[in-house]
Amino acid sequence: MHTPRHIRSFVLRAGRMTAAQERALTQLWPAYGVELGEGPLDLEAIFGRCAPRSLEIGFGVGEVIGKLAEQHPHKDYLGIEVHRPGVGRLLLRAAEANMRNLRVICHDAVEVLRDKLRDGSFDEILVFFPDPWHKKRHHKRRLIDAAFVAELAAKLRSGGTLRLATDWQDYAEQMLAVCNADPHLASLSSDHTYVPRPDFRPPTRFERRGERLGHGVWDLAYAKSETASALLSEEAAANPVDDELHRQSGKNHAR
């Protein structure tokens, strides 16, 4: 069966790579890199254990996932990033700290989630500062849309958390709309909008750059809630008129 090509959310640019990063990609990849073969990945075999597991998509230079993996050796961390200099930098950090709980994939995250990761694989998924594609004609390239959020929700275990952040307001509003609309996600914000920056997330270079440009930062947090999804489905079937009113109210609240 032919799978339609998706619009990529990234452009591979020839970024400057240091000699150390080049060596890391050659020498450290066998220890930390994950090769994509046929079929879904066996994450328990890759990490050599069954432990709480987090995924970071688009980790940049590894500021967040590197810190978390160092601080929480009892948890396993999988990072996905397409830009090789950032991958090399994280591999160097992992080797210096002798991390045993970190693995890296250098590939398109959309394809990895769709083809290589089993549903219910993660306790936490992080997507911080994806490319905002700020020009309107490029909005179709944005990573966070309804289809991708549905994939993220599927990869979470029940009760698992999804966290996102951006420094572009209209992208934050798009994230909010699609996440609030997903039937498997329940907002961790009391008013179904944004949450404070979590303490565990250090300010990234993208965040610092945005602050210098006068941008705000918007954090979002959700939990996977199969119970909420089932209740909403039952309520919609029993009260179709009330459900339509609820949806309209939600749209107004989400601005």
Located regions from the model:
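Conserved glycine-rich SAM-binding loop
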Residues: 60
